């Protein structure tokens, strides 16, 4: 899949492996993703964000020697479900979510993570328990 990737201090478009949903996760297609002020700050001052994160309990800082896919304000469409999901929403349903993945042992962020791509990728993984259905008639870009 294609993604806008923060790599070596620049944003580049490249391909990444397709994500595969694990237990409790949902594979989604990104329909729209806002450019947040935090994303702009990260683009210019990622090293400062990493230092700040080191002082926040429970947060894992980004490794700036590895790829990062930003994007934590997104609207997506459900494509598929991983194991152990309830499948309350049909594939094709538009959703948003907190930018976090519920994993065994805790929570991982989406977007400022080397392991969990954000909405600047064509597809991403979300936790089913955190999904919110986008109301019918509301445009994905709103």
Give the role of each language-model region:
Residues 13-15, 123:
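Well-ordered beta-strand positions in beta-sheet-rich domains
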Residues 60-67, 98-142:
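NAD(P)H dinucleotide-binding glycine-rich loop of Rossmann-like/cofactor-binding domains
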Residues 8-13, 59-60, 114:
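Short gly/ser/thr-rich secondary-structure transition/capping motifs
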Residues 17-33, 48-101, 130, 135:
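Glycine-rich beta-strand-centered segment in the early N-terminal region that forms part
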Residues 6, 43, 79-81, 126:
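Short beta-strand-to-turn element immediately C-terminal to the catalytic PLP-Schiff-base lysine
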Residues 1-4:
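Short structural boundary motif marking the start of a folded domain
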Residues 41-49:
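Short Gly/aromatic-enriched secondary-structure transition segments
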Residues 36:
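Short cysteine clusters
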């Amino acid at each position: 899949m294609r993604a806008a990737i923060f790599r070596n201090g620049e944003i580049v478009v490249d391909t990444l492996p397709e994500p595969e949903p694990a237990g409790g996760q949902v594979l989604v297609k990104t329909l729209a993703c806002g450019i947040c002020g935090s994303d702009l700050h990260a683009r210019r001052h990622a090293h400062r964000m990493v230092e700040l994160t080191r002082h926040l309990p429970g947060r894992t800082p980004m490794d700036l020697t590895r790829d990062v896919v930003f994007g934590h304000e997104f609207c997506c469409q459900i494509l598929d479900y991983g194991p152990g999901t309830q499948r309350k929403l049909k594939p094709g349903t538009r959703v948003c979510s907190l930018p976090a993945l519920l994993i065994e042992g805790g929570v991982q962020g989406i977007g400022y993570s080397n392991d969990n791509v954000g909405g600047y990728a064509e597809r991403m993984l979300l936790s089913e328990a955190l999904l919110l259905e986008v109301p019918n008639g509301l445009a994905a870009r709103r």
